[in-house]
Amino acid sequence: MRPLTPRQSEILELIKDNLHATGMPPTRAEIAHKLGFRSANSAEEHLKALARKGVIEILPGMSRGIRLVGDDYDIADGLPLIGQVAAGEPLLAEQHVEGHYKIDESLFHPAASFLLKVNGMSMRDIGILDGDLLAVHKTEQARNGQIVVARVEDEVTVKRFEQRGKTILLHPENEDFSTITVNLAEQVFAIEGLAVGVIRNGATL
């Protein structure tokens, strides 16, 4: 990877911080506001420069269409890649691990514990697409608005988390899908982890 300018490094850190805080990248307008640019177009030019250097990928037509790109995918002891999860079984059960991949640890804050292969398009509008690899920090806690990997009864899903008393709402980011409502008094629910980034599922995987 070619060296980044101080401003490019600042933008990259902002993207990582936003992913940490909310589970999604910032918009161009948010970048411009936080870094004092005159317009979102200025932020776009810096993002294009980062894309040319192979640090991010820009997804056209999406206000938050920014993905971090991991370029170190050598098979070795590293983050486990979780594929299809059988109903009722532990997420990190050995039979679910499709491989281990080394990834630059500085890409994610907090650190990723594992990668989850995304199944479906329910989070499409924030750039999480079918077949992508979701970097997940293993935790049982989440704040409202964060993107989580959650287990509802025997099923695992990726959604935006909201809690209202004894009710959990798991919101999709695609109008073709419906919010999942969980009654904690009647249903089994657990947070498996917090989304800390998305990696494009390239041909090397």
Curated annotation (Swiss-Prot):
Entry-linked CDD domains: S24_LexA-like
UniProt enzyme class: hydrolase
Q: Where is this site: Cleavage?
A: A87, G88
Q: Where do the catalytic residues lie?
A: S122, K159
> What does it catalyze?
Hydrolysis of Ala-|-Gly bond in repressor LexA
InterPro entries in alphabetical order: LexA, LexA-like, LexA/Signal_pep-like_sf, LexA_DNA-bd_dom, LexA_repressor, Peptidase_S24_LexA, Peptidase_S24_S26A/B/C, WH-like_DNA-bd_sf
The keyword DNA damage appears for this protein? yes
An MF annotation (GO) of this entry: DNA binding
| Enzyme Commission number | 3.4.21.88
Pfam families, alphabetically? LexA_DNA_bind (PF01726), Peptidase_S24 (PF00717)
Provide one Gene Ontology biological process annotation.
SOS response
UniProt keyword annotations, A-Z: Autocatalytic cleavage, DNA damage, DNA repair, DNA replication, DNA-binding, Hydrolase, Repressor, SOS response, Transcription, Transcription regulation
DNA-binding region in chain numbering:
28-48
SUPFAM superfamilies (UniProt xref): LexA/Signal peptidase, Winged helix' DNA-binding domain
- Read off the Gene3D superfamilies from this record: Umud Fragment, subunit A, Winged helix-like DNA-binding domain superfamily/Winged helix DNA-binding domain
Which family does the UniProt entry place this protein in? Belongs to the peptidase S24 family.
**How would you summarize the oligomeric state and partners of this protein?**
Homodimer.
Instruction: Describe the function of this protein.
Output: Represses a number of genes involved in the response to DNA damage (SOS response), including recA and lexA. In the presence of single-stranded DNA, RecA interacts with LexA causing an autocatalytic cleavage which disrupts the DNA-binding part of LexA, leading to derepression of the SOS regulon and eventually DNA repair.
Name this protein carries in UniProt: LexA repressor
Organism in which the protein naturally occurs: Idiomarina loihiensis (strain ATCC BAA-735 / DSM 15497 / L2-TR)
